[in-house]
Every structure is written in structure tokens, then in C-alpha cells.
Amino acid sequence: MSRKSKGINAEREIIHSFWKISGWTACRVAGSGSMKYPAPDIIAGNATRKLAIECKSTKSKYQYFEKGEIKQLLLYAEMFAAEPWIAIRFNRDKFYFLRPKDLKETKSRYVADLDLAKDQGYLIEHIV
């Protein structure tokens, strides 16, 4: 399975999770990350909240984000009046939802690891 297919499957898993929660809806943004306009991987919401979500699934102990990727998420969220979130799954574990401000910043990128995700992150049932 290609990296692209794995990413799409991870996004779909999150979308199904939102639809299982009463009053919530979610959809995948096709082409996110590959067009010149800022766009998250997933948009989710209910009658009172909107979430812009960047989704990652990794077998590694670390997940890196280019600074531009996070900047685009924040820009989209601001323009759409949505809450920016990052959903990360390490080693086929649960998805942890982090706020961009919780990521560790290096000179050129942002990074999250499983310990950070468990300490600072939320499971989906805690962000809805």
C-alpha cells in the first residue's frame, strides 16, 4: 500500500469516527497539501464548532511537520473560524489530537512523538 493510500485510509478512519458521534459531521478535503491554497486534510464540525484537522499516521517514533504545513493549517483555520488540530497515530495506536502550539519547534520543522501525544494530546471523545 502506498503512503498516499495509507494517509487517505487514516483520514477516512477519523471521518467515520466523527460521523459516529451524535451531531458531528466530517469530510475529507481532496488535494489538501498539493494545491496553492491552504486546506486541511479534514473539516469536521457540528452546529456550534468547526475543526480543521491535519492528519498523520506513522510507524516511526516521531512525526515531523514542515513549518509551512502548520502555517497553512493555522491560516485556513483563521479564515474559516475553525479550531486547528493535528491528528497523529503512532504505530497503529489510537489517534491523538494535538493543538499546533503543543508541537515541539526545531530550527526548520515541528515535531511530535508518542510521549508528547500521550501527555498533551486528546482522544477524539475528549475534543468533541
Language-model segments: which ranges?
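Domain-level recognition of nuclease-like catalytic cores that cleave nucleotide substrates
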Residues: 5, 83-128
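Active-site metal-binding core of divalent-cation-utilizing nuclease and nuclease-like domains
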Residues: 25-47
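Short, charged, amphipathic alpha-helix that recurs within catalytic cores of restriction-modification
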Residues: 58-89
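Amphipathic alpha-helical interface surfaces
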Residues: 14, 38, 69-72
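Conserved catalytic cores of phosphodiester-cleaving nucleases, focusing on short active-site segments
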Residues: 18, 42-59
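Acidic-basic catalytic patches of nuclease active cores, encompassing PD-(D/E)XK
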Residues: 1-31
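Alpha-helix C-cap/termination motif
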Residues: 21, 45, 79-80
